[in-house]
Amino acid sequence: ENRALEVTYLYGASGTGKTRGIFEKHDRKSICRITDYGGRNGVRFDAYHCQDVLVLEEFHSQIPISAMLNYLDIYPLTLPARYTDRTACYTKVYITSNIPLEEQYRDIQRYQMETWRAFLRRVQNVIEYLPDGSTVQHKKGGFPCDTK
């Protein structure tokens, strides 16, 4: 069965409250934080146990774009883990970073424009965390090659 998936990109300087905001919005037990990008396809889902919220922390294009497109897709998916792969059950994904969305996957933007567009289509919300603790919701279409 397909999942209704909401993907939110949060960015801003360290200490501005990106992760704190996620934990204030969701029950801790429903959150899986991914912080290790050393596995096959750039990530290991060893800590994932069907949580509803997936957080990709400190993201800087570590996951190959082909894998990332699958992780952010609505279709049924098996996630790579060390001993036993996991079934994706999450319906919310947060990608946190210190850099704006348009600075991710620079080579993909340059040489694989359709792939970059596919990535942008999967991101519904872009929120910037400012040093004063406030946030700015950016409109879709505010990024290069994003026409929506």
Where are these regions (language model features)?
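Catalytic glutamate of the conserved HExxH
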Residues: 58
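Short, surface-exposed beta-edge/turn micro-motifs
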Residues: 5, 51, 90-92
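Conserved alpha-helical scaffold flanking the Walker A/P-loop in AAA+ ATPase domains
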Residues: 35-54, 62, 66-67, 80-85
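P-loop NTPase catalytic core of nucleic-acid-dependent motor ATPases
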Residues: 1-44, 49, 127-128
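Structural motif
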Residues: 9, 53-55, 94
